[in-house]
Amino acid sequence: MGIQHEFDIIINGDIALRNLQLHRGDNYGCKLKIISNDYKKLKFRFIIRPDWSEIDEVKGLTVFANNYVVKVNKVDDTFYYVIYEAVIHLYNKKTEILIYSDDEKELFKHYYPYISLNMISKKYKVKEENYSSPYIEHPLIPYRDYESMD
């Protein structure tokens, strides 16, 4: 059947981007557009629940915000999940964020989802699903201990 990880992102403990993984494959990622009218500091928690059926190691995660590398820290690593965290500062009205395990252009164009988050109007939308089935949960009600950002 093929490998399928689960990949979610929690933003500020308030917004959850769910099912960002590909339908099949060892890659996970997404493209975000965040609209904000003033400076904001957002805390991101990246949660990978690996499918160990065909892999021995989970791929790392790379994050870029407006073409600048964002420092990503691994905060937990168990058999059931791997958690990374990062802080992204929004200085511009529009911030483009790329999150990925593999940066092939083809993955962003046809496979990874594209999501728009308007922090001004609080309208959050999946613009393109591509080869995934993402959805947005807001407000977030954490149903696993490691989803809480306290």
Curated annotation (Swiss-Prot):
Keyword Nucleotide-binding: no
UniProt-listed Pfam families: Pox_C7_F8A
Induction: Expressed in the early phase of the viral replicative cycle.
Keywords from the UniProt entry: Early protein, Host-virus interaction, Inhibition of host innate immune response by virus, Viral immunoevasion
InterPro entries named in the record: Poxvirus_C7/F8A
Gene Ontology biological-process annotations: symbiont-mediated suppression of host innate immune response; viral process
Record's keyword annotation contains Repeat: no
Function: Inhibits antiviral activity induced by type I interferons. Does not block signal transduction of IFN, but is important to counteract the host antiviral state induced by a pre-treatment with IFN.
Family membership noted in the UniProt record: Belongs to the orthopoxvirus OPG027 family.
Protein name per Swiss-Prot or TrEMBL: Interferon antagonist OPG027
